[in-house]
């Protein structure tokens, strides 16, 4: 992990590669590097830390029109200059960048590379050294590349330079995202389209176990058997302005403010000309034919799934289970006879979720992906897709994708309810419109959120979020946002569980953020607040208008109670943002985190 770029053409490759890497910064990384074909061979530049440091060491006088680049998020070996990509073979003939994990790299070293002295701790160096070993047996570069890949077990997206064939880039993909971009007398390679929108909007999607030979005039796709594959390019539905901050200091703040527009966009996309919710009939029938829904997700998407369970069970009266993908893949529960799977992933590339999807596909079960990236791996491999229509989300901490997931899940639940003849009792599209209006109000109250962050979180070591019913799930997401970007030890708890152990953590001055948006548990959560105050906690109560009481810290505009999670999370996002600012943290690129987790 975490991002690859490549360029071959007539322009200066260095600047294109560096700008491409900068567009991949949102994915998270700890080091970066580029390699370029120069007059006297391949030149490698790499540094631990930010791309700005890498820029400082790149020689502007080196003329080159071919190169590859990489941002690394450490999986094998500590973050360091030595472990940063690109990696080279001993003779320096081959230079390689790689995303993914080679599971059998130690076995490959033992069987094929015992005489090689390795420079780094990475699994990636094994690939480039194996490439050189295969060529030494008399194979052509292409044959050696295919042989090398056939010996590897795991995931990879690879860009390879050959010093003896300077006018081409070799590319390969398996279980890790990679695109080839099409230009006029140039071509590019990228982990996602955003990296290369500066030069093209035409991309060719690569499938698993394919290799590509890229020159400035041609793109040749082959399978591992050497058979040529024809595939037309697609136009990326993005604009370069979509991935710029504009006047905002951070992408996260921009994306928080975009949430009302996202909700309105979702309403428009999922209703017919009469204003009625309309989903694909095939999705509806597949769910109606099932006897239980299983939601599979990670992180923020998992929290969205917990709320989605409430929507589906309350609206459509269908049983739902929600599972963390990384646990489900090796601890699968006993399934019902006719399960239906919903995979939630902002990027559509989450490796843990994909591992489960592969399993359930092999079992013959139908699956739906809810993702912000149609055409992503999960989208391609599932039977159905519901797009989020949220636009690119650049900040590592998810905000607008989360509320988009909630909106789409509510629409899905309402559609199934209607098909089953269940009475919803309210007009969902109208109520979602009111949610968007409430979001506008909340986004205009940044000064209040900043003040709360300063009062409760600027200097604290830890923080607890409590809630009952669906507020508990929103609290989990609030705690995740806070810990992600401010590095405060934050945890979410069910209010009723406090007395079963958690309350032992409360000490004098501990901030406790309590959510009170559900009428049927309002008195219960108020009692929990009294419990923690009695132990010295510093409470911050966020309530819904109509449920507020004297002493509440912030009152949310009223929306339909079922949709309260979509508005209750906005203050938590903003409080987390301002807490991170007060603590001088990197809001958009928090330490140790990657936006798209493409390895298990």
UniProtKB/Swiss-Prot annotation:
Q: Which CDD domains does UniProt cross-reference here?
A: GFAT (cd00714), SIS_GlmS_GlmD_1 (cd05008), SIS_GlmS_GlmD_2 (cd05009)
Q: Which UniProt keywords apply?
A: Aminotransferase, Cytoplasm, Glutamine amidotransferase, Repeat, Transferase
Give the positions the UniProt entry annotates as the active site: 2 (nucleophile), 595 (for fru-6p isomerization activity)
EC number(s): the record gives 2.6.1.16
Q: Cross-referenced PROSITE patterns, in alphabetical order?
A: GATASE_TYPE_2 (PS51278), SIS (PS51464)
Q: How does it assemble?
A: Homodimer.
Superkingdom in the source lineage: Bacteria
Pfam families referenced in this protein's UniProt entry, alphabetically: GATase_6 (PF13522), SIS (PF01380)
Could you identify this protein by its name? Glutamine--fructose-6-phosphate aminotransferase [isomerizing]
Specify the taxonomic lineage.
Bacteria, Bacillati, Bacillota, Bacilli, Bacillales
**HAMAP family in the cross-refs:** GlmS (MF_00164)
Instruction: Give the encoding gene's name.
Output: glmS
Gene Ontology terms, MF aspect: carbohydrate derivative binding; glutamine-fructose-6-phosphate transaminase (isomerizing) activity
Under InterPro entries, the record lists: GATase_2_dom, GFAT, GFAT_N, GlmS/AgaS_SIS, GlmS/FrlB_SIS, Ntn_hydrolases_N, SIS_dom, SIS_dom_sf
GO cellular component terms?
cytosol
Q: Give the subcellular location.
A: Cytoplasm
Q: Name one GO biological process term.
A: UDP-N-acetylglucosamine metabolic process
């Amino acid at each position: 992990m975490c991002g690859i770029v490549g360029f071959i053409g007539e322009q200066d490759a260095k600047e294109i590669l560096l700008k491409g890497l900068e567009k991949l910064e949102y994915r998270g990384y700890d080091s970066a590097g580029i390699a370029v074909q120069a007059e006297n061979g391949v030149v490698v530049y790499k540094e631990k830390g930010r791309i700005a440091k890498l820029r400082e060491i790149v020689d502007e006088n080196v003329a080159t029109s071919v190169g590859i680049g990489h941002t690394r998020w450490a999986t094998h070996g500590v973050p360091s200059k030595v472990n940063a990509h690109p990696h080279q073979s001993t003779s320096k003939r081959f230079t390689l960048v790689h995303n993914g994990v080679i599971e059998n790299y130690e076995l490959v070293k033992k069987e094929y590379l015992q005489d090689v002295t390795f420079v780094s701790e990475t699994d990636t160096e094994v690939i480039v050294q194996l490439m050189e070993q295969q060529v030494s047996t008399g194979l052509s570069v292409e044959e050696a590349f295919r042989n090398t890949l056939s010996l590897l077990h795991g995931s990879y997206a690879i860009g390879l330079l050959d010093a003896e064939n300077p006018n081409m880039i070799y590319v390969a993909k398996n279980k890790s995202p990679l695109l080839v971009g099409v230009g006029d007398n140039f071509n590019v390679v990228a982990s996602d389209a955003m990296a290369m929108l500066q030069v093209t909007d035409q991309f060719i999607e690569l499938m698993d176990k394919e290799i590509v030979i890229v020159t400035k005039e041609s793109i040749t796709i082959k399978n591992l058997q050497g058979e040529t594959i024809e595939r037309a390019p697609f136009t990326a539905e993005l604009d370069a302005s979509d991935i710029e901050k504009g006047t905002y200091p951070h992408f996260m703040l921009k994306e928080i403010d975009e949430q009302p527009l996202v909700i309105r966009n979702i309403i428009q996309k999922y209703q017919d000309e009469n204003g009625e919710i309309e989903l694909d009939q095939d999705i509806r029938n597949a769910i109606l034919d099932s006897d239980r829904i299983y939601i599979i997700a990670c992180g923020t998407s998992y929290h969205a799934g917990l709320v989605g369970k409430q929507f589906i069970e309350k609206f459509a009266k269908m049983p739902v289970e929600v599972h963390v993908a990384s646990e489900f893949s090796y601890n699968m529960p006993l399934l019902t006879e006719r399960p239906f799977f919903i995979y939630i992933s902002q990027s559509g590339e989450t490796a843990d979720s994909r591992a489960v999807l592969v399993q359930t596909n092999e079992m013959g079960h139908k699956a739906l992906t809810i993702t912000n990236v149609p055409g992503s791996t999960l989208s391609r491999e599932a039977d159905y897709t519901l797009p989020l229509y949220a636009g690119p989300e650049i900040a590592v901490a998810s905000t607008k994708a989360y509320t988009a997931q909630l909106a789409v899940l509510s629409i899905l639940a309402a559609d199934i309810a209607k098909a089953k003849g269940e009475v919803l009792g309210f007009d969902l599209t109208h109520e979602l419109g009111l949610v968007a209006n409430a979001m506008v109000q909340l986004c205009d109250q940044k000064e209040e959120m900043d003040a709360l962050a300063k009062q409760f979180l600027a200097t604290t070591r830890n923080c607890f979020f409590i809630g009952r019913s669906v507020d508990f799930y929103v609290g989990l997401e609030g705690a995740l946002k806070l810990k992600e970007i401010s590095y405060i030890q934050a945890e979410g708890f069910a209010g009723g569980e406090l007395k079963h152990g958690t309350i032992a953590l409360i000490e004098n001055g501990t901030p406790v953020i309590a959510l009170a948006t559900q009428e049927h548990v309002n008195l219960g959560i108020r009692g929990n607040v009294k419990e923690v105050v009695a132990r010295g906690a510093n409470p911050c109560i966020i309530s819904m208008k109509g449920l507020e009481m004297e002493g509440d810290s912030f009152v949310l505009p009223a929306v339909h109670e079922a949709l309260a999670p979509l508005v209750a999370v906005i203050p938590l996002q903003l409080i987390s943002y301002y807490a991170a600012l007060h603590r001088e943290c990197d809001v958009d690129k928090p330490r140790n985190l990657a936006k798209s987790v493409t390895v298990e």
